[in-house]
Amino acid sequence: MPARAPRRLVQGPRGTWLLGSLWVWVLCGLGMAGSLGTPQPCQAPQQWEGRQVLYQQSSGHNNRALVSYDGLNQRVRVLDERKALIPCKRLFEYILLYKEGVMFQIEQATKQCAKIPLVESWDPLDIPQNSTFEDQYSIGGPQEQILVQEWSDRRTARSYETWIGVYTAKDCYPVQETFIRNYTVVMSTRFFDVQLGIKDPSVFTPPSTCQAAQPEKMSDGCSL
């Protein structure tokens, strides 16, 4: 996702790959101190796999998913997780290939595939260099604490943020990412069980059924 001001959009493919489960907390690390002692944004890992829980105000639901994130090649794979029996709920796999400008949506049960253009540019899951440092604190209790830093796109003390990212201080892993619009949280994503690297790069290769993909996005519901 290209260099830009740290304002992230909550729509289109960006919202989709976070929605596939399922970037609004984010794990990040402690940056080096600046000339005035203020922490600087750290460099988040560019290739990792983990899990996420996405909350969207529009649906009022939490969506869980497995995530493979490849920032080097600008691609993301999201695999819906079933944690409860929800009547008429379809589970999907999402493969977003930003260099090719396309997203594949694959129904897990039937392998039915949809091929949808990506109209937004790549927006990496990281802390933009012009972000504002908000706070540093520990998550958890004694003997189980993890130090994190909180960043936002707030420009002055009198302005309000539209994006907040939380990253671990040690290795800059994403913990949470939050988007706000009109003083209301519209999307929030938590990241956990993060492991560095991509175990199987083939997860970014669409199945053969996508050779005859339909052009419209599939609904996650079903007809009764």
Curated annotation (Swiss-Prot):
Gene (name only): Epdr1
PTM summary: N-glycosylated; the glycan contains mannose-6-phosphate moieties.
Full protein name: Mammalian ependymin-related protein 1
Any GO MF annotation of the entry: ganglioside GM1 binding
Signal peptide region: 1-37
Quaternary structure annotation from Swiss-Prot or TrEMBL: Homodimer.
Known tissue expression: Detected in brain, small intestine and in soleus, extensor digitorum longus and white gastrocnemius (at protein level). Detected in brain and skeletal muscle, and at lower leavels in heart.
Record key words, sorted: Disulfide bond, Glycoprotein, Lipid-binding, Lysosome, Secreted, Signal
Family: Belongs to the ependymin family.
Natural source organism: Mus musculus (Mouse)
A single cellular component GO annotation: extracellular region
InterPro entries the record matches: Ependymin
Keyword set includes Magnesium: no
Keyword set includes Magnesium: no
Pfam families xref list: Ependymin (PF00811)
